[in-house]
């Protein structure tokens, strides 16, 4: 049985990730890239508390698009601002702390 380094509880009972999701302020915005392609950027994710690769995988599947995790931010191909907010809220992030620009 593994013990969480942060809270000291067994990993099955650990609540560190849920607490981190409620506290973080996320920014979701779009930018134009090469050849006029639109990318949705999600930044403000603390990589130490949340598995950013797993979050990217879930967002790509729910938004039906390609994407990647780079430099502490998630990049999704296309304009998915509204869908990303819905998915993040379903995953436990507070909708009040998700800022859409």
From Swiss-Prot:
One family name in Pfam for this protein: SUI1
Example of a GO MF term: mRNA binding
InterPro entries registered for this protein in UniProt: DENR/SUI1_TIF, SUI1, SUI1_arc, SUI1_arc_bac, SUI1_dom_sf
Keyword Electron transport: no
GO biological process, one term: formation of translation preinitiation complex
Keywords: Protein biosynthesis, Translation regulation
SUPFAM superfamilies: eIF1-like (SSF55159)
Family annotation (PANTHER family): DENSITY-REGULATED PROTEIN, DENSITY-REGULATED PROTEIN HOMOLOG
HAMAP family the record matches: SUI1
Family of this protein: Belongs to the SUI1 family.
NCBIfam families named in the record: PRK00939.1, SUI1_rel
Protein name in UniProt: Protein translation factor SUI1 homolog
Organism: Methanothermobacter thermautotrophicus (strain ATCC 29096 / DSM 1053 / JCM 10044 / NBRC 100330 / Delta H)
């Amino acid at each position: 049985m593994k013990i969480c380094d942060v809270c000291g509880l067994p990993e099955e009972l650990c609540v560190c990730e849920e607490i981190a999701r409620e506290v973080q302020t996320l920014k979701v915005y779009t930018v134009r890239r090469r050849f006029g392609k639109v990318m949705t950027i999600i930044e403000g994710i603390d990589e130490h508390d949340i598995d950013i690769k797993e979050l990217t995988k879930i967002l790509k599947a729910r938004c039906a698009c390609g994407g990647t995790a780079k430099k502490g931010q998630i990049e999704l191909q296309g304009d998915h601002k509204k869908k990303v907010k819905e998915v993040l809220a379903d995953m436990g992030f507070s909708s009040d702390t998700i800022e859409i620009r």
